[in-house]
Amino acid sequence: MSDDLALQGKRALVTGGTKGIGAAVVSALREAGATVLTTARSQPAQLAHADQFVTADVSTAAGCAMVAQAVGERLGGLDILVHVVGGSSAPAGGFAVLDDQEWQKALDQNLFAAVRLDRALLPAMLAQGSGVIIHITSIQRQLPLPDATIAYAAAKAALSNYSKALSKEVSPKGVRVVRVSPGWVETDGAVGLVEDIARQHGTDYEGSRKIVMDSLGGIPLGRPAQPKEVADLVAFLASARAASITGTEYVIDGGTVPTV
């Protein structure tokens, strides 16, 4: 690996790092040489580097405080912060069934987790005059889907706007802030969804895949992204090769978003 892509000696935190995009990001950063602390609400039964894992719910203020404390105790500081945690657990039924509690859950998980951790960890980055913060948003922030994900889409739009504003404030002080906006990514959870749709529609996996792609308005590349592709982009953005990149959002969606 070329020196400007290497992350030897760098200390990283990845939230939501035990599965899907998060697990791929953890692997990519470690392969590049970084020491990576990761966190999730529960610890998998078999987890490599279990000593570099914190069980915490970062959708809560207490969980964020616990993770921030662990960063200081186990890493002694931070160079790279990747916010992967997010998602939606809202019931189907559209806007009418989403009460204040569901909206608050979406905001806590997809916006406030990042805000609280940034607030706790940024001061040390600013003091050292360097660091990278990467917020994982979603193409739904500009291409929202109906039904259960309306609050999720709104929260991701807020995260994107917050991230851009933060970059303007802290970039002059040496801390870069970047956004990565995935479209459909073929995680284990996504595979399970496709298999469920296949059973419901009496089709095979490829037929079900097409149903999902059509629901997004089509994917010009003809396939979803893989978690490793998103992780490789994150690792690049965390590296010295991206030293002049800040305040930008990188869309990785196979061409799904139809606008410029």
PLM feature segments, named:
Residues 171, 176, 245-247:
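Short, small/polar-rich loop/turn modules that mediate ligand/substrate recognition or access, typified
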Residues 207, 218-230:
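A conserved structural motif in NAD(P)-dependent oxidoreductases
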Residues 2-4, 92, 143, 223, ...:
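Short C-terminal tail/terminal secondary-structure segment
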Residues 123, 168-169, 243:
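Alpha-helical segment proximal to the catalytic Tyr-Lys
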Residues 91-95, 99-107, 133, 215:
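Substrate-binding pocket helix/loop in short-chain dehydrogenase/reductase
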Residues 11, 18-19:
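Conserved glycine-rich cofactor-binding loop
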Residues 134-158, 163-172, 184-185:
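Catalytic loop of short-chain dehydrogenase/reductase
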